[in-house]
Amino acid sequence: MPNEAALPGEETEVVVVGAGQAGIAMSEHLGNLGIRHIVLERDRIAERWRTQRWDSLVANGPAWHDRFPNLEFPDVGPDAFATKEQVAEYFERYAEKIDAPVRCGVEVSKVRKHEGRPGFRVETSEGTIDAGFVVAATGPFQRPVIPPIVPEGAVRTQLHSSEYRNPEQLPEGAVLVVGAGSSGVQIADELRRSGRRVFLSVGPHDRPPRQYRGRDFCWWLGVLGLWDLTTPPQGAAHVTIAVSGARGGHSVDFRELAGTGIELLGMTDAYEVGDAGTGGVLRFAPDLAENIALGDEKYLELLRAADAYIERNGLDLPEEPEAHVLGPDPECMTDPRLALDLAEAGVTSIVWATGFAADYSWLDVDAYDENGRPDQRRGVSTEPDVYFLGLPWLSRRGSSFIWGVWHDAKYVADHITTRRGYLAYGSN
């Protein structure tokens, strides 16, 4: 797509910042409504899928589900899981299909309100743009978060999951993976399969079945209405989801992971410096069994809801009683390790699969709550004519998924259309 330079003094109706799934979806709906806009992307379309994911990553949802409504994944079966390269190519192809006005290689440094008149001044690496509306479509994965627990130099390598690529990248030795969501579980499993000794620190999580009675969990959440929940269940706002599309897709079972040789630990709690300033001892909370039990209960709850739905609707789906049977607790659960001497265990690397934080330092407007988070309802912020898109639970549980952000973008585009009408009244 051409990298058209932004000219000083250029004007447009809407500036969309970010050309990932949120920015591309936003562009489609604005284009359908005939609203002039520009999508600014500091790197390439879907850059994070290209360069901030490990080599073997695939989508966590099947191709029939994790896509925009108007384009299927080419060369990917409906029940298969697209590779990260195929996902990036999909977004690029979609941008071409809708003729999205994306400008790659343009970084937004600051957005400020005009003084004494409506609209915003958008400062970029290629000049300034005046716009009536701004959509922040950069999503929640801006700044990798590594808890300040283990000091630099305690082990040979510490890196965030966004920097991890493959087992060969890490020095020889055992690996501690902190975080048991989709990223942490898949990375730990890959490292174990490569022959590494692996420790996995497990916190609160939700582990839905990959498939149950012949249907993917994405289908079950749809027919049970769970994608449409508008607020997370109590205490679940920051609970990670452990699900995997790797190796054709499978349910995450922490007991099975322990059976393969991965040692499970509770949440990483504190670090004590070793005698020589290296190695040291990591301490873990005594919450491993509790965390796994809570994940098990959510898993079984979904199975029970699916069974009830099948019976209520007279569906002819295969029985799967074995899915309800949990295996025996491994020793690492019944007698959990609460301290790990890193040098003694041969740990040379720590992979922090501990999530991300948003970064809106470039968006200098009054659109944040007392905790610095976007203050918005369904993407409409408290700062008139500023919108957020691509955030988890923006309007519903499905908001952070490809198909979910598409529907959120339509709502935002319709809201912009309504605002345009009010602002244009009496201007002629």
Language model features with spans:
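Flavin (primarily FAD) cofactor-binding/catalytic cores of flavoenzymes
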Residues: 2-51, 79-428
